[in-house]
C-alpha cells in the first residue's frame, strides 16, 4: 500500500517532509520546497517501498493492524478487541500503515537510476546542497537546519537563553511536568 501525495492526492508520495508533516510526490515536492529559500531548508526523507506486515505482539501469528501507544504493542484485529475492553478503550491506538522511511545511510537493495536521481535531489544536510552522498551522513530530524550565508539575527549578541535562566530552547525536559508554585 503506497501513500498518496498530500498535495495533489493523485500520485504516490516519494518524499516525507517533517516540517510540513506531509507526504509528497516529486512534482509537488519541487513546487512546495523549491519555491523559496526557507522551504528549501526543510528536512525531507524518501519513502521506501512498503515493508512486510509486522506480526501481532500478542498472538505472534496474525499481521498487526494497530499500535497502542499506552501498551507499546502492535496488535491484530482480534487481539485488539480482546485486550482493549472496558476502560482500555481510551488507549490511543493508531493504524499501522507499513510505510518504511529511507534515511541517509540505508543501503538500497537495488541501485537504479531513478533512486540515484531521487537521492541527489533531496538534501540530506539541511543547507540546500544535494550532492548525492548519503552513505557517510545521518540526519537528526530534531536539529535546526544549518543557516548558510545569512545575516545575523536581530538579538544584537544577547544570549536569550541565559538571560532568563531557562534551559536552551532545543532541550526538552524528561519526566512529568511540574508547575512551580507562584509566589
UniProtKB/Swiss-Prot annotation:
<keyword id="KW-0539">Nucleus</keyword>
<dbReference type="InterPro" id="IPR000315">
    <property type="entry name" value="Znf_B-box"/>
</dbReference>
<keyword id="KW-0678">Repressor</keyword>
<keyword id="KW-0805">Transcription regulation</keyword>
<keyword id="KW-0863">Zinc-finger</keyword>
<feature type="binding site">
    <location>
        <position position="33"/>
    </location>
    <ligand>
        <name>Zn(2+) 1</name>
    </ligand>
</feature>
<dbReference type="Pfam" id="PF00643">
    <property type="entry name" value="zf-B_box"/>
</dbReference>
<comment type="function">
    <text>Acts as a negative regulator of seedling photomorphogenesis.</text>
</comment>
<dbReference type="GO" id="GO:0005634">
    <property type="term" value="C:nucleus"/>
</dbReference>
<feature type="zinc finger region" description="B box-type 2; atypical">
    <location>
        <begin position="56"/>
        <end position="96"/>
    </location>
</feature>
<feature type="binding site">
    <location>
        <position position="59"/>
    </location>
    <ligand>
        <name>Zn(2+) 2</name>
    </ligand>
</feature>
<feature type="compositionally biased region" description="Low complexity">
    <location>
        <begin position="154"/>
        <end position="163"/>
    </location>
</feature>
<feature type="region of interest" description="Disordered">
    <location>
        <begin position="105"/>
        <end position="183"/>
    </location>
</feature>
<feature type="binding site">
    <location>
        <position position="84"/>
    </location>
    <ligand>
        <name>Zn(2+) 2</name>
    </ligand>
</feature>
<feature type="binding site">
    <location>
        <position position="8"/>
    </location>
    <ligand>
        <name>Zn(2+) 1</name>
    </ligand>
</feature>
<feature type="binding site">
    <location>
        <position position="79"/>
    </location>
    <ligand>
        <name>Zn(2+) 2</name>
    </ligand>
</feature>
<keyword id="KW-0479">Metal-binding</keyword>
<feature type="binding site">
    <location>
        <position position="28"/>
    </location>
    <ligand>
        <name>Zn(2+) 1</name>
    </ligand>
</feature>
<feature type="binding site">
    <location>
        <position position="56"/>
    </location>
    <ligand>
        <name>Zn(2+) 2</name>
    </ligand>
</feature>
<dbReference type="InterPro" id="IPR049808">
    <property type="entry name" value="CONSTANS-like_Bbox1"/>
</dbReference>
<keyword id="KW-0677">Repeat</keyword>
<feature type="binding site">
    <location>
        <position position="5"/>
    </location>
    <ligand>
        <name>Zn(2+) 1</name>
    </ligand>
</feature>
<dbReference type="GO" id="GO:0008270">
    <property type="term" value="F:zinc ion binding"/>
</dbReference>
<keyword id="KW-0862">Zinc</keyword>
<protein>
    <recommendedName>
        <fullName>B-box zinc finger protein 19</fullName>
    </recommendedName>
</protein>
<feature type="compositionally biased region" description="Polar residues">
    <location>
        <begin position="114"/>
        <end position="128"/>
    </location>
</feature>
<dbReference type="GO" id="GO:0010100">
    <property type="term" value="P:negative regulation of photomorphogenesis"/>
</dbReference>
<dbReference type="InterPro" id="IPR051979">
    <property type="entry name" value="B-box_zinc_finger"/>
</dbReference>
<feature type="zinc finger region" description="B box-type 1; atypical">
    <location>
        <begin position="5"/>
        <end position="47"/>
    </location>
</feature>
<keyword id="KW-0804">Transcription</keyword>
